[in-house]
């Protein structure tokens, strides 16, 4: 925990070069789910020097509280985990962790949050409310946000507003965008298993083709979603299909 007295002007504004360095440093050390030791250490290396209370309310979560003595606090949330993806970009700051990559922009999100923390430190005396910056793990997987919500942090620090953000490459440089209501979709992941009966393809009539059943399910589900696309903004897609063990044997089990 780091507790410092507010001292506006004693801390330098972050530069674009600083933010670029943060992003590239973090891009090289992608970690997934709650297993984020290097990422957490990097976040601490920046915010521990600032006039804020630094604490970890739950597993792999780092918070920085800039106290203005107000009963009102604005929270800013960034995600910190990467994806189980192999990077092949060839850039000088490419991932050094095999099989892991910041492919969804969380390195950029963290860089912006660290830059914001330094900006707040430089202008702390000018704020009329406190600020809590939250570095959240497991956004891509098991739901790190739930543990933060259940920790009592938002109640303890009187959070009455919270903002998240996401990089959007289609926006012009220097622009941000929002809209009333829902903006980004929540996701639910499902696994479907189809059971059949394996037989030699020459005797296909004696078997039950789980692969055909799975493919028909996908096509009919896609057709159904297309028919109701005008009713609500939602989508259904399958990204993985595993079936069969031999070319000449009817598949007895299919996973989607």
Residue ranges of each PLM-predicted region?
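Acidic/His- and Gly-rich active-site-bordering loop/insert found
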Residues: 2-102, 107, 111, 115-127
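A glycine- and small/hydrophobic-rich beta-loop-beta segment
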Residues: 255
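Histidine/acidic-residue-rich, glycine-tolerant segments that coordinate divalent metal ions
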Residues: 83, 91-101, 108, 125-252
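Polar low-complexity intrinsically disordered regions
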Residues: 1-6, 10, 17, 177, ...
């Amino acid at each position: 925990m780091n507790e410092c007295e507010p001292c506006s002007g004693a801390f330098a504004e972050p530069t674009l070069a600083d933010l670029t360095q943060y992003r590239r440093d973090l891009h090289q050390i992608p970690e997934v789910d709650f297993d984020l030791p290097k990422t957490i250490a990097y976040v601490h290396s920046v915010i521990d020097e600032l006039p804020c209370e630094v604490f970890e309310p739950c597993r792999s979560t780092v918070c920085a509280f800039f106290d203005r003595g107000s009963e009102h606090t604005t929270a800013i949330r960034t995600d910190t985990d990467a994806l189980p993806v192999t990077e092949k970009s060839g850039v000088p700051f490419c991932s050094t962790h095999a099989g892991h990559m910041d492919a969804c922009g969380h390195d950029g999100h963290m860089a912006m949050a660290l830059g914001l923390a330094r900006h707040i430190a430089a202008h702390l005396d000018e704020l009329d409310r406190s600020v809590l910056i939250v570095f959240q793990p497991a956004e891509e997987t098991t739901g790190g946000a739930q543990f933060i919500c259940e920790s009592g942090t938002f109640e303890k620090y009187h959070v009455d507003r919270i903002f998240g953000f996401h990089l959007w490459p289609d926006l012009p440089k220097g622009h941000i965008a929002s809209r009333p209501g829902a903006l980004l979709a929540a996701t639910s992941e499902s696994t479907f298993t189809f059971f059949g009966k394996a037989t030699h393809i020459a005797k296909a009539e004696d078997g039950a083709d789980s692969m055909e059943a799975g493919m028909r399910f996908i096509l009919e589900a896609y057709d159904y979603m297309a028919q109701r696309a005008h009713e609500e903004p939602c989508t259904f897609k399958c990204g993985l299909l595993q079936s069969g063990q031999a070319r000449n044997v009817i598949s007895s089990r299919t996973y989607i």
